[in-house]
Amino acid sequence: MPKVISLQTSFNSGVLDPRLASRTDLKHFYQGAEEATNVITMPQGGVKRRPGFKYVATINAEARLASFAFNVEQTYLMVFTNLSVAIYKDGVHQADVTTPYTTAQLFELQWTQSADTMILVHEDHAPRKLVRGGSHSSWTLSTITLSNVPQFDFGSGAEDVWSGTRGYPKSATFYQSRLWFGGSLQRPQTIWGSKTNDFFNFDDGTSLDDEGIDVTLDTDQVNAITAVYAGRHLNIFTTGGEFSIQDSPITPAKVAVRRETLFGSTSIPPKMIDGSVIFIDRTGKSVREFLFSYNEDAYTSGTVSLLASHLLNSPVDMDVSKGTSSDDANYLYFVNGDGTMAVFNTLRAQEVSGWTKWETTGEIESVSVVVDEVYVIVKRTIDSSVVRYLEQLDVDSYTDAN
């Protein structure tokens, strides 16, 4: 019999799930791969070897990473560890600041930023602000003084809705000149908006347009809020579904919460990329894009991990690197519970999307992107000792920091 040789000129679909091994009826079959480890798929169709992870610093404890960007030139990497945060600029240590967040709370911590101030929230702690001073090494963390805290009757008369007993906000975002808090220990379905341009004042007064907002989701079951996110609209992610508030502007008299989809999400904060908000659904096995449809005047939550769902293994962290030019793809990095990383590239305008797997001789535990620089925390075994390194993806490095 003659031998049939097929020519494959594109790998845009990346790694394909083993269950698709015989799906010759799919176009992805002809631009995918059975395995693609430690490579990067390019929107033009090719693949290239991923850069190495360059050593930056030794971290002496479990850590979680976050980015802080005042502008494209003044950017910082935050390394949260037990009761402390270390601040780096361009890979150089600048300062250490004491925090109240324990190791067990690090991956429950959420934040949002406005100019030189980062708002930090956790349901066990009063909201705090991390403020950059006049130099790269000048930082201050303090408890936010909130005025006119919303009141609620928990059964013994009206009291502050947030307290050490009742819990504090677990998510936050800035939207339409208000600071929004989402969910707390004993008010898991409620969102609160500050007064307009008065971020720490939640006075609802007489419900004038610029006054505070207090809204509880109207659902048939308790869907605890996992994140509030400023996307095209104010998006609300919960354990049981996804919601939006599309009013413009949102006021106490005009705030309609719309239930959009019913997938639910984990506590990993969502990310905006390529016109959609990416979130991990409550199963921890699917990545979905919360995308507004003009035709339906509603949001959809299609899965973007269907073709390579086997690369996801209980994700614990994620971040996004946005393309810097019109022909460069966007990349999403998902840190798995087993220490590997699933990398998704997307360029919607060119119908490009694909997954690859990254691994190293160690376990990747956290990821953060500072502008276009990718940083990770890696747990490695060096000379029989377990260490944790802060490492940076570096195009000039051909090996990892072993």
Annotate the PLM regions.
Residues 109-111, 178, 216-402:
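Beta-sheet-dominated scaffold domains
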Residues 84-158, 340-395:
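Beta-strand-rich solenoidal segments
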